A protein has these predicted regions:
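NAD(P)-binding Rossmann-fold cofactor-contacting core
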Residues: 238-256
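Rossmann-like adenosine-cofactor binding region
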Residues: 124, 250-344
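Phosphate/diphosphate ligand-binding glycine-rich loop within oxidoreductases
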Residues: 114-196, 211-212
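Short, low-complexity intrinsically disordered segments enriched in small and basic residues
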Residues: 1-31, 46, 53
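Oxidoreductase and adenylate-handling cofactor-binding alpha/beta cores
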Residues: 173-192, 237-241, 370-378, 383
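Glycine-rich NAD(P)-binding loop of Rossmann-like domains
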Residues: 191-230
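Rossmann-like dinucleotide-binding domain for NAD(H)/NADP(H)
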Residues: 161-162, 299-398
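N-terminal glycine-/charge-rich "phosphate-binding" loop or analogous flexible N-terminal tail
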Residues: 37-39, 43, 47-115, 397-398
Length: 398
């Protein structure tokens, strides 16, 4: 619903005519827990009429109060919210200057805040602590991915939570697709052989010629959440690959929409040249990828993990890789992270370790802040929301 729709719903405040400047004092009506509240959405608002199209009007009145919170302080916020986004946030809200840590919050420094912006390093408090320290709080906009570590006390206390998890999923999807395309060409094993000596060049050529490439090659996905589904779409639409997927929450209709074939993990590991893990990080999935599955990998198969390390029984993966050196593991995550000194992963030729780089890095992080600013604008103006996280969703999200 646009701003004009909200204006026209105001009881005895506006007629069907275009609202005047004097009438447009408060333009957001939010029914929250049965309480009607009126807010402005910043210095300007656009009101749409059939005759006049769009006209811009100055809006005066009290605005919602917002604050940035992060245990990493200013540096943590600047990683995700660039100057342009923060300036636009200041035009939507009255801001409490500074960045506040959990200690600051418990000390009562954001008691007037109704909206919070954060990212990795979001302060973790109990439901009671939030209620005491931020009694006016209505919404949290989290410019990062998983909210599992902090969201439950807020949601159970009636605070709405929004996350940029889909924005953070874009670079993970891109990274994963790139790794799959390389793996299907035999890149990792061929690169290992070529790097040893000139004499190993012929062995590298024999190795990569045993691969099918990226035409009708079976690829397996464990998990079809936002990232898994994004990977599936790209593999099906941009490449002619046969995608097998396992996800107990995915229906046949959803699988058909994505163009994937549902299969159990045993079939996926036995059939697919490349298998990529995108399972949600919940207690039920811990240790689900074990020797019974890894031992089924094809002799030149690749296992990719950009999800979470906890789903992998690492000693079982090591065993399967040692039994068949032509197999490869590309691990952007481990459990713990990083792996402890002396772990078998270190020094194994067929293990590629990266320091959790699949997610947003550098300028990619600013996309998450920009998406949360846009979601906050939508929330204020009554437009359809895109990235809200509910208690029900939290049970199955990564």
């Amino acid at each position: 619903m646009g701003v004009w729709g909200l204006l026209s719903r105001s009881p005895q405040r506006f007629s069907n005519a275009s609202p005047t400047l004097q009438q447009a004092q408060k333009i957001r009506c939010s029914i929250y827990k049965g309480v009607r509240k009126w807010y402005t959405i910043g210095e300007t608002a656009r009101c749409r009429t059939e005759k006049k199209g769009e006209e811009t009007m100055n809006i005066k009145g009290n605005r919602l109060c917002a604050a940035y919170v992060n245990d990493g302080g200013e540096a943590g916020i600047r990683r995700v919210y660039d100057d342009a986004t923060r300036a636009q946030t200041g035009r939507l809200f009255d801001s409490i200057p500074g960045v506040f840590t959990a200690e600051d919050i418990r000390a009562g420094k954001i008691r007037d805040a109704q909206v919070l912006f954060s990212t990795w390093g979001m302060p973790v408090l109990t439901r009671e602590q939030w209620a005491d320290a931020a009694p006016k709080l209505e919404a949290v906009f989290y410019g990062a991915g998983s909210v599992r570590y902090f969201a439950e006390p807020l949601l159970s206390g009636g605070v709405r939570v929004f996350s940029a998890w889909q924005a953070n999923g874009i670079p993970v999807t891109e990274f994963t697709v790139a790794q799959i395309i390389l793996a299907n060409k035999g890149f990792y094993g061929a690169a290992r052989l070529c790097s040893r000596s000139r004499a190993d060049r012929q062995a590298a050529e024999r190795y990569f010629r045993s691969f099918r490439g990226n035409y009708d090659t079976p690829v397996g996905l464990i998990g079809l959440g936002a990232i898994g589904a994004g990977v599936a779409r790209r593999l099906v639409q941009d490449y002619r690959l046969t995608v097998y997927a396992y996800d107990p929450f995915c229906t046949q209709e959803r699988a058909a929409e994505l163009g994937v074939r549902l299969a159990d993990p045993e079939e996926i590991f036995s059939t697919c040249l490349t298998v990529s893990n995108h399972t949600a990080n919940i207690p039920a999935t811990r240790g689900m990828l074990n020797y019974a599955l890894f031992s089924r990998m094809l002799p030149n198969a690749t296992f990719i993990n950009t999800g979470r390390g906890a789903q992998v029984v690492e000693e079982d993966l090591v065993r399967a890789l040692r039994e068949e050196p032509g197999r490869t593991a590309v691990l952007d995550v481990t459990d713990p992270e990083p792996s402890p000194e002396g772990h078998p992963f270190y020094g194994m030729d067929n293990v590629i370790l990266t320091p959790h780089i699949a997610g947003s890095v550098g300028a990619e992080c600013f996309r998450m802040g920009a998406w949360m600013l846009d979601e906050a604008r939508r929330w204020l103006s009554g437009e359809p929301l895109r990235y809200e996280v509910t208690e029900k969703m939290l049970a199955t999200m990564a």
